Amino acid sequence: MKIELDSFSGNKIYPGRGTLFVRGDSKIFRFYSSKTASLFKQRKNPRRIAWTVLYRRKHKKGITEEVSKKRSRKSVKAVRGIVGASLDVIKEKRNARPETRNATRAKHAEAAKERKEKEAERRKAAKAAHVAAGGPKVSKLGAKGSAPKVQATSR
């Protein structure tokens, strides 16, 4: 025995009861009584009609003891060492004070700045030595040994 549900009120429809309404887009609506069919055809909202199941669900009527708070399980992330840093190093960095963190950051920044300046000086010196050596300016293609440009022979 198949028990259907009223499309408007949400009530049960037992075999031999109710009517079917098939809309133009072939969607089927089942109604328990002419009352629910009439309200549906008037385009009434079942959430606003006090005796419908949808109204009772919306306004939390009836079944209150069944509702219990859903408990979500939170995944706990295990802290472990990664490549290049052991667990001890990670814990030490995590527990470091902001002052020490800022000091080490400043120290590393200073060291990087000095390295950059030394590299710039080295490049400058290399360029100066190259210019001092003199020598003719040769295009890169000429230096690579590319084919010489063909001279015009018509004149």
Curated annotation (Swiss-Prot):
Q: Which CDD domains match?
A: Ribosomal_L24e_L24
Q: What is the lineage of its organism?
A: Eukaryota, Fungi, Dikarya, Ascomycota, Saccharomycotina
Q: What is this protein called?
A: Large ribosomal subunit protein eL24
One cellular component (GO) term of this entry: cytosolic large ribosomal subunit
Q: Does the keyword DNA damage apply?
A: no
- Locate the transmembrane regions by residue number: none
Q: Which InterPro entries does this chain map to?
A: L24e/L24_sf, Ribosomal_eL24, Ribosomal_eL24-rel_N, Ribosomal_eL24_CS
Domain of life (superkingdom): Eukaryota
Keywords assigned: Ribonucleoprotein, Ribosomal protein
Which family is this sequence assigned to? Belongs to the eukaryotic ribosomal protein eL24 family.
A Pfam family matched in the record: Ribosomal_L24e
The segments labelled Disordered in the record are 93-155
Give an example GO biological process.
cytoplasmic translation
Task: Name one molecular function that GO assigns to this entry.
Answer: structural constituent of ribosome
| Stretches with biased composition (Basic and acidic residues) | 93-123
This protein's species is Yarrowia lipolytica (strain CLIB 122 / E 150) (Yeast)
